[in-house]
Regions:
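Interhelical loop/hinge segments that connect adjacent transmembrane helices in multipass membrane
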Residues: 1-15, 20, 58-73, 191-209, ...
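Membrane-interface helix-loop junctions in multi-pass transport and translocation proteins
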Residues: 143, 150-185, 189, 193, ...
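Membrane-interface junctions at transmembrane-helix termini in multi-pass inner-membrane proteins
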Residues: 120-152
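Transmembrane helix-bundle signature of multi-pass secondary active exporters and lipid flippases
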Residues: 7, 11, 15, 34-53, ...
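Interfacial/gating helices of multi-pass transporter permease domains
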Residues: 4, 21-42, 108-114
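Alpha-helical transmembrane segments of multi-pass membrane transport and lipid-handling proteins
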Residues: 48, 72-127, 157-161, 165, ...
Length: 280
């Protein structure tokens, strides 16, 4: 219970202080502009979290009865699914966010592309921790890194003030990214692999970097394709949306079609579709 309380306090320091610092340094107007983008990201995150919330119970069952090798296999599958969904949403957000805000609220409410990108990076970094946090929770590894979460919050506040005064809203969001990267983004996977699976964590970090490279490459290709689109705002948005749906997923299928995790998820998806067909 003590570890959970400390983790909650750290979470508040990381997640709930940015708006206070933004309004203090840049004013309420900047907070309001940023809130439109935060709303989009929170909506995406809520949808994706429904998927991973359903997985947590299954992971708990696997951890209770299966071998360590089976646990690691399921971890890799969930981590792969995690990457696919969050990388796809991150790419789509960067390309579509300003168009959505322009259509819904007007062009005067859009933020610079650098702020959109750093917001999306924070979304991706947190999202990529889902598999790790799921296993950390179901394995009961709360004690590992409990004080580091508070450290993340303290670093975030200090850097947000320093970088916020220098670069404004971008600096505050960059501070959040840095505070996570230097603490729990590397330590939580380390704890799960070393103390949960009794395994070398370097394989995870190698996979993380591989997925990151694929994500950046996919984003670059998708963005080039989207930049070709011309026309009025609504028509451009529709075409960009189609591009964001098709190109990342097609590229992921081409790149990962032979990977064990993809094959497993494909077979599972086929099984679900067949069950739905029988019911209908």
């Amino acid at each position: 219970i003590k570890a959970l309380i400390i983790i909650k306090i750290g979470g508040v320091l990381v997640n709930s202080t940015d708006n206070i610092i933004i309004s203090s340094i840049k004013g309420l107007a900047a907070t309001g502009l940023n809130s439109n983008y935060t709303l989009l990201l929170n909506t995406l995150n809520s949808i994706l979290q429904q998927i991973f919330n359903g997985i947590t119970a299954s992971v708990g069952n696997v951890n209770a009865v299966e071998t360590n090798e089976k646990k690691k296999k399921m971890f890799k599958i969930i981590n792969f699914l995690n990457f696919w969904l969050f990388a796809w949403c991150t790419i789509a957000f960067i390309i579509l966010a300003n168009s959505i805000v322009s259509i819904c609220f007007g062009t005067r409410y859009i933020l610079g592309q650098n702020i959109v990108i750093i917001s999306a990076i924070n979304f991706y970094v947190v999202g990529m921790q889902n598999a790790v946090w799921t296993y950390k929770t179901t394995m009961g590894l709360f004690d590992y890194g409990k004080y580091l979460v508070v450290g993340t919050g303290v670093i975030n506040i200090i850097l947000s003030i320093i970088l916020g005064q220098k670069w404004g809203l971008f600096g505050i969001l960059l501070a959040t990214f840095i505070s996570r990267i230097v603490t729990n983004v590397w330590y939580d996977p380390y704890a799960v692999l070393k103390y949960g699976f009794k395994d070398n964590p370097m394989e995870y970090f190698g996979t993380y970097i591989k997925y990151l490279i694929v994500g950046v490459m996919t984003f670059t290709i998708t963005r080039i394709c989207a930049s070709i689109i011309t026309g009025n705002m609504l028509v451009m948005f529709i075409w960009k949306l189609i591009i964001c749906i098709l190109i990342p997923n097609i590229l992921f299928i081409i790149i990962f079609c032979r990977q064990e995790e993809f094959i497993y998820l494909k077979e599972k998806s086929k099984g679900i579709v067949n069950k739905l067909k029988k019911k209908s």
